[in-house]
């Protein structure tokens, strides 16, 4: 190589180095995708839209409002005077210290993740990068309705910024994961009418890049059935006193989202008094009547609802079950596919969670009893079933609320013949309780790593 050629090569190399430096500087200057934090069931404050009185979370029952929705045959039109305001950042009762819910996660994203919180209605000039938006929503309502609201808000921001190609990352806790999955698969479309099968369009791929599902019950939860039968429990404790927030089964009956958290079709594990498997179709109203589950048959029902609501109750109940079934079918309609969106599952399985039910006919009353917890009982023939025997069939690995089986959608994935029906890039397990996942520092740091492009692709990574 002569001197002139060497000079040319040096010149080309220098220009290439300058170009690469400029390109890397440009990429660094672009900032990170904005992220959306979606809470789970009961994770948003609910206020009266006229008086601004906070109804949830509020330990002492309001004198003017409760959480029950008006009963209508059309589940998608069930609204009242309550609207979602902020996410639940912490819960404080009386003189006791506040309990972190999502406030710690937001702070971690700001201090360790390099994000800043923005408002949907009035984003700053740079609200399209390194930003965090909280998606508070009325968690009582139909999940499809809330998924469509999410897409509408995202599209609205993109128009405000005049950035049609802008994409958001999502961190969705618990039921929020079902909302984000539907938004990703179907965009702002409703469930198909009648008996038409859902066909995922992955319309959400134009809006979303990464979705982190944090403790999401992808196959539902037996606890939701328990809530519909016995009332809503907070921390496995059922409280229903006159001066405390109503959590009775009559309140839960009016909440469409409660039905949509039932175990997905053909995933419920049920056993008889011999602890042998029995087939139960949760989405057949006749089954609810057979086992004494239908709250409409309760003697107190008429005293809890108006005459108009009593007339509509059966139509509403059947519609709520049907829509819940169709939502689960829609979420399972693209097994193993992700539509170009990266899904990450982050959860816990170091504890236990209710995984099934046992149905027993009472020898004295001839009525059915439904067991969710391992409590010993005596069969009609006098033989006993111990708590330890029940524990083996009723309880599975999980985070106290969601089983690992539901979190990973294992039953549906196995039936579909795919590794993950959710199409997840990876599964990560960190030892924590369901309601404390977002507040866990290890979970926060792991999610920050995912958002920064450092998420592992190794299946079944576990940290105890």
Positions of the model-derived regions?
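Bacterial N-terminal signal peptides
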Residues: 13-25
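N-terminal secretory signal peptides that target proteins for export/translocation
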Residues: 1-11
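Intrinsic-disorder/low-complexity loop/linker signature
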Residues: 52, 126, 272-275, 291, ...
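C-terminal subdomain of alpha/beta-hydrolase-fold enzymes, centered on the catalytic histidine
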Residues: 299-464
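N-terminal non-catalytic accessory region
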Residues: 29-171, 175-263, 267-282, 388, ...
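Serine-hydrolase catalytic core
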Residues: 274-288, 296, 333-339, 345
């Amino acid at each position: 190589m002569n001197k002139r050629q060497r000079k040319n090569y040096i010149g080309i190399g220098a220009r290439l180095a300058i170009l690469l430096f400029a390109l890397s500087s440009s990429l660094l200057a672009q900032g990170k995708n904005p992220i959306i934090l979606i809470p789970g069931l009961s994770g948003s404050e609910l206020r009266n839209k006229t008086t601004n009185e906070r109804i949830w979370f509020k330990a002492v029952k309001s004198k003017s409002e409760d959480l029950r929705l008006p009963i209508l045959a059309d589940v998608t039109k069930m609204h009242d005077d309550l609207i979602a305001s902020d996410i639940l950042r912490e819960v404080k009762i009386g003189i006791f210290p506040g309990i972190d819910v999502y406030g710690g996660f937001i702070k971690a994203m700001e201090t360790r993740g390099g994000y800043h919180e923005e408002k949907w209605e009035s984003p700053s000039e740079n609200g399209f990068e390194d930003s965090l938006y909280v998606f508070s929503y009325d968690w009582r309502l139909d999940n499809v309705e809330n998924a469509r609201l999410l897409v509408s808000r995202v599209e609205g921001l993109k128009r405000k910024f005049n950035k049609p190609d802008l994409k958001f990352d999502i961190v969705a806790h618990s039921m929020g994961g079902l909302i984000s999955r539907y938004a990703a698969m179907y965009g702002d479309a409703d469930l198909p009418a009648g008996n038409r099968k859902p066909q995922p369009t992955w319309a959400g791929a134009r809006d979303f890049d990464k979705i982190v599902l944090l403790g999401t019950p992808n196959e539902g939860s037996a606890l939701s059935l328990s809530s519909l039968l016995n009332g809503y429990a907070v921390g496995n404790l059922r409280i229903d006193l006159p001066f405390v927030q109503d959590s009775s089964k009559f309140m839960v009956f009016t909440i469409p989202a409660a039905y949509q958290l039932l175990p997905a079709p053909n995933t419920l594990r049920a056993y008889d008094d011999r602890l042998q498997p029995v087939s139960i179709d949760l989405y057949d109203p006749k089954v609810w009547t057979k086992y004494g589950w239908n709250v409409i048959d309760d003697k107190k029902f008429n005293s809890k609802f108006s005459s108009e609501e009593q007339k509509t109750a059966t139509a509403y109940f059947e519609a709520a079950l049907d829509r819940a079934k169709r939502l689960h079918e829609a979420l399972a309609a693209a097994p193993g596919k992700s539509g170009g969106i990266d899904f990450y599952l982050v959860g816990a399985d170091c504890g236990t969670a209710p995984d099934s039910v046992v149905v027993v006919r009472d020898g004295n009353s001839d009525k059915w009893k439904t067991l969710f917890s391992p409590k010993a009982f005596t069969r009609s023939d006098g033989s006993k079933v111990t708590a330890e025997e029940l524990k083996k069939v009723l309880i599975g690995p999980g985070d106290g609320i969601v089983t690992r089986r539901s979190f990973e959608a294992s039953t549906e994935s196995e039936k579909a013949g795919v590794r993950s029906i959710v199409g997840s890039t990876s599964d990560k397990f960190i030892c924590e309780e369901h309601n404390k996942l977002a507040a866990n520092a290890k979970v926060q740091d792991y999610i920050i790593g995912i958002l920064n492009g450092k998420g592992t692709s190794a299946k079944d990574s576990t940290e105890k």
